[in-house]
Amino acid sequence: MPAEPAVVSHEVRTGYFWKRPADFMLSGLALVALAPLFLVISLLIKLTSPGPVFFRQQRLGLKERPFSIFKFRSMRTGSDKTGAQFTSANDARVTGIGKLIRKTSLDELPQLINIFRGEMSLIGPRPYIGFELENATPDERRKRASVRPGVSGLAQVSGRSSLSQQAVIDYDLQYVEQCSLKFDIQILIQTIRKVIRCEGTN
């Protein structure tokens, strides 16, 4: 069930109002600028494995409203319905192109569409599948869902896949408390560094 609307502090509201206009503008510019890269990746996916270019999955967004997240498909068609829920470094379900775009985080680029549509933000807690929040308290879920989910966030630059689920939630809650333009820029810079170094990727 979707969480009830959270009561967000005055500090969070005043540090958050600028995010949507900035996200809309930056995602729109990025979609135009990166259109050639989108085309190249799309062609490589289509030429090397049968199936759609995009992978869609239902996630929980603002106020835990469900939405479809977009990624470039990196696994063989039907692999998400069988086998382990999470992938490993040498997962046979991942295609050759899939390994490359995962390692470089290029598989996340289509989430610019989610940002442009208002479903996500550049920076924020990652959008979860419902079962990933089963151990979170109702208060933690409400607070976490009081902001739009992000392509990257504090947890992702603080350990990413090496963190426990509770540690990720704790980082998410810390982000909600400290949300500001300066904080988002700091996380964005750290994210770019990690992507360049291919840190924390499968």
Where are these regions (language model features)?
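Short, charged cytosolic
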Residues: 1-5
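Short, glycine-rich, amphipathic interfacial segments at transmembrane boundaries or analogous
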Residues: 55-93, 151-170
